[in-house]
């Protein structure tokens, strides 16, 4: 008897669904551009009638392009299909605007690392501004505690926001680690990590 090998499924890096289901989501243009850049050999099989977005344009369609597609969809012969297409295009436009706003908010934010003197020769560092970048403070504190062999905890500051407090003067190493975390997220390479 022969054993069956499990089927290998590739998941989208944008919407995290299997590639065949991306067309039903609101981030289809971004999913297509991701697939074309990461798996160009799969793009022609999943989207056979669609031109490669890398050859057409590198970014997702703008709001004006989506509006023109919306007008074309309303001119369709089937009213139900036109209505569904119009709703999908509206959701795509809203989703794209929301993503752009979040990205600009993240790019304008900064992470502050403060070095505070505890005793004459002992210091702690306080890291604040992590909530915008979706970095969980508890996981970061645990990582710092194991990485630097020091005590680390999460406390609320005066503004009722979480900040990570690490014992010892490890501000340079913490800055490097946080910059590495931000470079892993798309579009956040230029975010400032400021020691003070």
Curated annotation (Swiss-Prot):
Residues 111-182 form the SUI1 domain. GO terms for cellular component: cytoplasm; ribonucleoprotein complex; ribosome. GO terms for biological process: formation of translation preinitiation complex; translation reinitiation. It is found in: Cytoplasm. InterPro entries: DENR/SUI1_TIF, DENR_C, DENR_eukaryotes, DENR_N, SUI1, SUI1_dom_sf. It comes from the Eukaryota. Pfam families: DENR_N (PF21023), SUI1 (PF01253). The keyword Transmembrane helix does not apply. The keyword Endoplasmic reticulum does not apply. The SUI1 domain may be involved in RNA binding. Belongs to the DENR family. This is Translation machinery-associated protein 22. It comes from Lodderomyces elongisporus (strain ATCC 11503 / CBS 2605 / JCM 1781 / NBRC 1676 / NRRL YB-4239).
């Amino acid at each position: 008897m022969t054993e069956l090998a499990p089927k290998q499924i590739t998941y989208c890096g944008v919407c995290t669904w299997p590639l065949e289901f991306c067309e039903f989501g609101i981030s289809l243009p971004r999913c297509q551009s991701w697939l074309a850049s990461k798996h160009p050999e799969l793009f022609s099989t999943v989207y056979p009638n669609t031109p490669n977005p890398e050859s057409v344009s590198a970014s997702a369609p703008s709001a004006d392009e989506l509006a023109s597609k919306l007008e074309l969809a309303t001119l369709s012969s089937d009213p139900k299909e036109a209505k569904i297409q119009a709703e999908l295009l509206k959701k795509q436009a809203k989703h794209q605007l929301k993503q752009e706003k979040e990205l600009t908010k993240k790019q304008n934010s900064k992470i502050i690392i403060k070095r505070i003197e505890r005793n004459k020769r002992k210091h702690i560092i306080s890291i604040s501004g992590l909530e915008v970048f979706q970095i969980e403070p508890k996981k970061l504190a645990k990582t710092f505690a194991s990485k630097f062999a020091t005590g680390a905890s999460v406390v609320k500051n005066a503004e009722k926001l979480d900040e990570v407090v690490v014992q010892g003067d490890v501000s340079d190493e913490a800055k490097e680690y946080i910059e590495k975390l931000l470079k892993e997220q798309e579009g956040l390479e230029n975010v400032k990590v400021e020691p003070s």
